[in-house]
Amino acid sequence: MSKILKIAIPSDDGVTVKTSLCSSRGYVVATIISVVIVHQEMRWNLLSEIMTACDGRYYNLHDCTHVIFHVISERRREILTGKGIEVLLTDNNSVNVALADFLATASAYEHAKQIA
């Protein structure tokens, strides 16, 4: 049985990777099974949720396994890894290219596991 991965990327428009987590209007969240994107959605950061949810600005990441950023502070990295979310970095501005890079890496990893 394949593991389900949920990858979040901060974005204001669903197309461009946002450089700052704090000012991001939301996240593109992709559900991946067997190195294939089976669902993709935009989750908006609503002020009401940020102000009232237990996790504040991280409420949209509650079911995510990975987050892809341009830059992240050590403190935010610690918070996310403490929640069990793996933090990855990209130098791509395109959400689709960042996801494709992730899938290529995941595919190579799965292939290496099968050979070993």
Predicted regions mapped to residue ranges:
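Glycine- and other small-residue-rich loops at beta-strand/loop junctions that grip anionic moieties
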Residues: 69
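Short, glycine/polar-rich helix-capping loops at beta-to-alpha or helix-loop-helix junctions
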Residues: 72-78
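Non-catalytic interface/targeting segments
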Residues: 1-56, 62-63, 82, 90-116
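Short helix/strand-capping connector loops at secondary-structure junctions
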Residues: 78-84
